[in-house]
């Protein structure tokens, strides 16, 4: 599609006519530099891990929680897509006798010639309530959640690599608005450094503001961590209970005093 030359210029032609002629130095500059002031605001002094669910008793609270849009099943949406394309799927989106247990990771065998048990395992992490309370904490726990899902499915967090999806309200001249993505990126960077795991960057969007009849609404500060790692397909653990008497284990995590993840505890 192109010929590499020693002119240090990128030239594009339409027929014999030059339509683009840019210097390599200009391309390397990545465009004009932009500067903005950012102010990271204080967070509300409350326990972000406790969410008040309405109901007089446990049964009512359970049903109320299941009606939360962030908890409800997305089976109808998932079934609109063919999860078997490519014949590489190791775990179907839903497992169990009734196919009602949702899988928390995506496991796909690598498309190589012949047979292989080598697969990729990918999971995402994001808590909108936590990110709304503090983008810094929310971004940090996005990485922890992605790692937790991979470990629960039989993968190794130590070999994970990440890419992020960011989504924030429309940026203005207000330093507090710029403080939200700044805080989220700092939280993400802190987790990557403490866990020793790298990210290749990600996709960002700063257009999450919408005009309605009652005014402008904004998306909550959003940083979703997508983590992927190689895995042997034979070692993958599906989430459904296999036999009567199977045990479920809770690996409890105690946050630090500032409510950030205790990565040293989690590593153990």
Regions found by a protein language model. Give the residues of each.
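Glycine/proline-enriched, intrinsically flexible loops and inter-domain linkers
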Residues: 1-268
